Amino acid sequence: MNCEVRKYQKLNELAETNGIVVFGGREDMNIFLGELRQAFAIEQKMYNRSIAGLSVKDAVAVYDECVAPIAPETVLIHIGEADRKFFEEHPSEFDNKYRELLSHIKSQNKKCRIAVISLRNYESNPQIEEINKHLKYIADFEKCEYGNIANKKVWNPKSTMNAVSFIYDIGFIRPLKNKRPLYDLVKILFCCEA
């Protein structure tokens, strides 16, 4: 983990503030941010600060080292897969650590949009289902968005790209500089399988 943290600290020297950050674990490290940003005409800078094995127990410290320096406008948090055993043994401590992370982010940047992303649960695992219930509750309690990616969704990225392109071509979105809804970002980044 230390090697990845140092790598992100170096990359932060090149990064710009007010972007979108994916802050997750191993399965998020390979999200193709550049291609998805271009394909869906996302104007904000996007950065992936995901770390293999990232635990909610270490999340605040890792956030401070890897994410806070670039003062993101939006953070998409996808943490919990590495915490399944911790959750099983200490569910209330898991909740407290997650809420601590969200409160910490808000204390550093009150205007930061935060989305808590569920764990994928394509096999209907009861433990993951329970973790996702906790994540939903935590997101609601902390007044954050909740992105549910637990089940496979029927989604056609090509038709979404065509719709976005058409809307931009006729001038409805780009001139207004509207922020993309967080759920759209979640769908684009976490439900698009290459």
Q: What annotation goes with each model-predicted range?
A:
Residues 1-52, 57, 62-71:
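Serine-esterase "nucleophile elbow" of acetyl-processing enzymes
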Residues 38-42, 61-194:
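Alpha-helical cap/lid subdomain in secreted, periplasmic
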